[in-house]
Every structure is written in structure tokens, then in C-alpha cells.
Amino acid sequence: MENQHAEIVAVITMKPETVQGGGAPVFVVVDEMELQETSMTIEKIMDASAHEINKETRIIVAR
Amino acid sequence: MGTYLLPVIIGITFGFVARMLLLRTDFRQYPTYPTGRIIHLSFGFISAFIGAVAIPAVLESDWTAVTFLGLAATQFREVRKMERESLENIDTFELVKRGAPFIEGMAQAFESRNYLVMFTALITTLCAVFSFWIGVIGGIVMLVIVKFNMSGKFLSDIADVKEAEIRFEGPTLFVDDILIKNVGLEDTRKTITKQAVGAIVTPKNQNSIVTLSFLGQRQAMLHHVATILGSYLDSGEPALIPLTKRDMADGRIALFFLPREKDFNQIRAVLDKVPILDSAIRMPKEADKSNS
């Protein structure tokens, strides 16, 4: 409940040109279905949660 | 010393009975452990004993014995420390955490119960010195006071609970009109729509707005619901962790959680019975805010 430190552990996107490289790996996918599947896989592996930035991009955030 | 034996025994008995009355295993499931029970009953016995012998010590002008009462208080602070430590250790493995303020409140309760027992034994012995029956009556009166006057306030005293709709606007999860969080996965959104329940807690006055804004109090509500009604949750599923958010404008609290039991009448009954933590009680209304 206290203020936690949050970190982006991965970025999944259909529009790689809108994401600049940084600390987190960027996964490039082709369609909505692959976007959902990849996000889900990474979410489960990292025990983190997926959040929607926009229709094309999801980020995986670990706390 | 023979003259005081009976009063002391009555004092110890009533003190010990008081401790047993206060030690109940309720839905919060603590203290359920047999070892925990033994610890508290023996501490209760010791404090009843200390309380009971205080009066004869005063009557005999044995002042050294009286000062030992002060020493006993230090011992009971240990009870608080012990409770706090064991509850904190357990809390790290809890799916929905109790939170440090809740634990502090429970530890405090355990300490104060020992003082209550000591006080009960003391008063009972004092009465019993005059006559056996006055002692018994005094003891029973103390038991009634201890049992019924020492329970704290509940959430229903300071706020109203009502059911609220869970809905998504795109990726954003709302409980009624209060924003909870952003959910990225279609699958998680489906689970939430199916399993989650929303509740809005509306404070009754200015004091309760401040009390409810306390994060510890909000975590206590979530823990309470999760222990009694279960939760649809596992470790490593941060997307499903129950959350509370506050409407900063009017102080309403939105609760988002995934209980196993979704009947809202039960949920309301459980939420109404959430204890108000001592550390959460704020009374800004009592403060002098005038420009003098």
C-alpha cells in the first residue's frame, strides 16, 4: 500500500517507430492478437502487470 | 498473610476469567494457534496475580512489593513487541496484507488487555478485602465493564457502504466514477468484469473523511474482506490485487476487490464490521483553527 517503486520491464508494440530504446526490451508484434499473447506471456513470466499506453502499445510494469 | 489469601484468590480468579473472556477466536482467526493461546493465558494469569497482590501489599505497607507493579508494566510491553513481530512475519506471506497499522493496533490491544486484567484483579481484591460477597460482585461488575466497554468503533459508525458498478472505459478501470487503474490485457479485463466487486465507502462527516484517507485503514478493509469472503487471487498476479482509491474532492473511498463470495449483502455486512484502527482516528474538528 505504501508508495512503491515501479519499473517498466518490457514494451510490446505494433508501432516500433513510436517507442525509443531505453532500459526495457521492446517486442515488436504485427497484430492485436499477437500483442495480447506476448503481453500475457511476459506478464505471467515476470509476475508483473500489463498496462495499455495506446491501442498499439502495452508496457509490462513490475513493482 | 492468611487473612489476605481468600481476597487474592478471588482477585486472581476474576482476573484470569477476564483474560479468557477477552481471548476469543473470532473470524479474524487470531489467536487460533494453541501455543499462542497458552502464551496469552499464562501472561493473563501472571498479570492477574500481580494485580491481586498489590492491595494486600499496600495494606501491609510493603512498599517494595508495590514498586514491583511498575516493573511488571515493562514486562507487558514485551507482549506488544512479541505480537508485533510474529504478526509482521506472518504478514509477509499474506496474499492481501494486513498492513503495519492494523498489526500495531492488534499488538496494542494485546498489551492493553493485560493491563485490564491487572486492573480487574486489583479492584476485585480491593472489594474482597472487605467481604467475600462484595468481592464477587465487584469482580462481576468489572467483567461486564471489560467485556462490553472495550470494543472499538466499526466502519458502519463513521461511513456508509454501497455497491458500485465495475466498468471499463477502454483500458481504464472505474468503480462508479472513481478511477482505479489501467489494465492492459483483454483476458484480465474479462476476469475482472466477471469476478470483481466494487464498493463505495462514503464518510459521514469531516472527521471520518480524514480517518478514511489513512492508507492503513483502507488496507485493513481490504484484508478484512479477503479473510472473510476469500479472494480470487494468487501470488504473481499484481493485476488482480485489490485496491482502494480515494476521490480527492469529497473523500469517498472506492474499493476494488475480487471476493469468492459475491453476494453484496454479505460484503456490506463484512465491511460494516471493519474495525476503525486507533492509529487512523483523527479529529481535525476538535482542533482550534481560529485566527487568534
Model-predicted segments: where are they?
Chain A
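Short, compact, well-ordered microdomains
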Residues: 46-63
